[in-house]
């Protein structure tokens, strides 16, 4: 399973890339605005220059014509752009139009297998079930991800699943176990995935044992 960052923070993206684990980004106008940015296109282009994998960014339009027009323009910003289209009736139709033009689509705000099924049929490159938001209303977000993965696998469809609205590391590990192709995570969750108190304790013990014998001398000293 690949890891994407769900953010518009350039420094967080740079750090994820330096770690060697982040291979894509998902973002939207809300995430860009949280960073105090006003030039949406400039921010997205900068992200695309930092990450060489897919960068999903969202349209604002709600009708088919506007979504398609915005998507065509956004797709020109960089070669690794993927356009996020909402899983609405209009969004599915827009996805079909864009897929016929070889514009990659991430069907976002997906909450059911049926939405993902239609998105895949329309030619979406990715579908993004929102795990945390489903959990928030008492539904089982990971069950929806499981159903979508099983459906796509059974029919050998090329559409990939991005587990989105990830709230904690357990969401990510569960997504990996059930076969999601990608999990897009907030920067804070990425850091939580790496950290464990027993790792910190072990590092401290190794350091203390070394100092007892070798003092302050390092391995390369």
Describe the residue ranges of each PLM region.
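Histidine/lysine/aspartate-rich catalytic loop segments that bind and position anionic ligands
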Residues: 109-144, 151
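Alpha-helix-loop-beta-strand connector modules within alpha/beta enzyme cores
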Residues: 41-55, 92-105, 141-161, 205-220
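C-terminal alpha-helical cap/extension of soluble enzyme domains
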Residues: 152-221
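Active-site beta->alpha loop and helix N-cap motifs at the rims of alpha/beta catalytic domains
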Residues: 2-14, 19-22, 26-97, 131
């Amino acid at each position: 399973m690949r890891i994407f960052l769900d953010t518009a923070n350039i420094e967080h993206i740079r750090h994820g890339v330096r770690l060697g684990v982040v291979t894509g980004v998902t973002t939207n106008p809300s995430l860009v605005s949280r960073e105090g940015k006003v030039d949406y296109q400039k921010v997205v282009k900068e992200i695309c220059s930092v990450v060489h994998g897919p960068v999903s960014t969202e349209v604002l339009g709600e009708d088919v014509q506007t979504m398609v027009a915005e998507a065509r323009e956004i797709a020109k910003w960089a070669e690794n752009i993927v356009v996020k289209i909402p899983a609405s009736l209009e969004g599915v139709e827009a996805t079909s139009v864009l897929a016929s033009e070889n514009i990659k689509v991430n069907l976002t705000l997906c909450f059911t297998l049926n939405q993902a099924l239609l998105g895949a049929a329309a030619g979406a490159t990715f579908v993004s079930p929102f795990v945390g938001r489903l959990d928030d209303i008492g539904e089982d977000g990971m069950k929806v991800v499981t159903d979508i993965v099983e459906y796509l696998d059974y029919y050998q469809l090329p559409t990939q699943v991005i587990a989105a609205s990830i709230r904690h590391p357990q969401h990510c590990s569960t997504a990996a176990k059930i076969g999601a192709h990608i999990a897009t995570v907030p920067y804070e969750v990425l850091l939580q995935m790496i950290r464990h108190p027993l790792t910190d304790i072990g590092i401290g013990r190794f350091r203390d044992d070394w100092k007892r014998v070798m003092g302050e001398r390092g391995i390369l000293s």
